[in-house]
């Protein structure tokens, strides 16, 4: 068992969310539901950006909910790729390794290797503004790779892309993250995107279901999910 949320309760500005979750090492899990349901809140709680009202978050055998965000075994990719426009692509990626204005030759080499893994070989000298939206997403993914955290969370980082590109990016995430044994949680409001997961947690009205097989969730939805999907 890699990640566990045990009786987690979060209360923010009148919104309350309850979540229990168990995910094995290397799992590729979708959190599916409408906007405002609490999907991003779950990720923010795991990352340490919002406090728990009660419950526990564990990674392996250790509780992590008391740790500051920087000390948790988590890397997060947000909707905004957070690429600095005044730094070239390689330097942006190397920020996962150093905050120095000029990274070392070794850090630059590692950044270039990460860029190659996501299909951006030879683009390290480019400026972010010269990249397409899909290429910027790949550069941000390369930076997450270099963070080398065992848990990666994707908070709809590809939402600005078209459906085909989103699915291509999710497939790339599965390849480069899942292939390295990392556990991945990704947020989606699109059942087609969520279908790429190993399992789906449905998040609606502040309640999250346990992970269930993709076909069970999408082929025979019930309750609020059935209404949301229009089936």
Task: Give the positions of each predicted feature.
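Helix-to-loop junction immediately C-terminal to a conserved catalytic motif
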Residues: 47
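ABC ATPase NBD coupling module
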Residues: 63-78, 99, 105, 217-221
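Short coil-to-helix segment of the ABC ATPase nucleotide-binding domain corresponding to the Q-loop/switch region
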Residues: 87-96
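Conserved ABC ATPase "signature" region
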Residues: 105-123, 174-175
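Conserved ABC ATPase signature
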Residues: 127-131, 135
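A short, proline-enriched helix->beta-strand linker immediately N-terminal to the Walker B motif
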Residues: 146-150
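Catalytic Walker B motif of ABC-type/P-loop ATPase nucleotide-binding domains
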Residues: 152-156
């Amino acid at each position: 068992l890699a990640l566990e949320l045990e009786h987690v309760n979060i209360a923010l500005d009148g919104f309350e969310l309850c979540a229990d979750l168990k995910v094995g090492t290397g799992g590729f899990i979708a959190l599916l539901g409408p906007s405002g349901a609490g999907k991003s809140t779950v990720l923010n709680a795991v990352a340490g950006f919002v406090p728990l009202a009660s419950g526990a978050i564990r990674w392996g055998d250790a509780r992590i909910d008391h740790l500051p965000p920087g000390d948790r075994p988590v890397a997060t990719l947000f909707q905004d790729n957070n690429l600095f426009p005044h730094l070239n692509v390689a330097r942006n990626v190397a920020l996962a390794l150093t905050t120095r204005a000029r990274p070392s030759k070794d850090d630059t080499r590692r950044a270039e290797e990460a860029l190659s893994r996501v299909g951006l070989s030879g683009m390290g000298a480019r400026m972010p503004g010269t990249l397409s939206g899909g290429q910027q997403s790949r550069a941000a993914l390369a930076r997450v790779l270099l963070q080398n955290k065992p848990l990666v969370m994707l908070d709809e980082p590809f939402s600005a892309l078209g459906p085909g590109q989103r699915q291509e990016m999710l497939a790339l995430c599965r390849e480069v993250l899942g292939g390295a044994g990392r556990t991945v949680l990704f947020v989606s409001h699109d059942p087609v995107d969520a279908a790429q997961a190993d399992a789906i947690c449905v998040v609606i009205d502040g309640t999250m279901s346990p992970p269930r097989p993709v076909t069970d969730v999408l082929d025979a939805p019930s309750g609020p999910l059935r209404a949301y999907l229009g089936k």
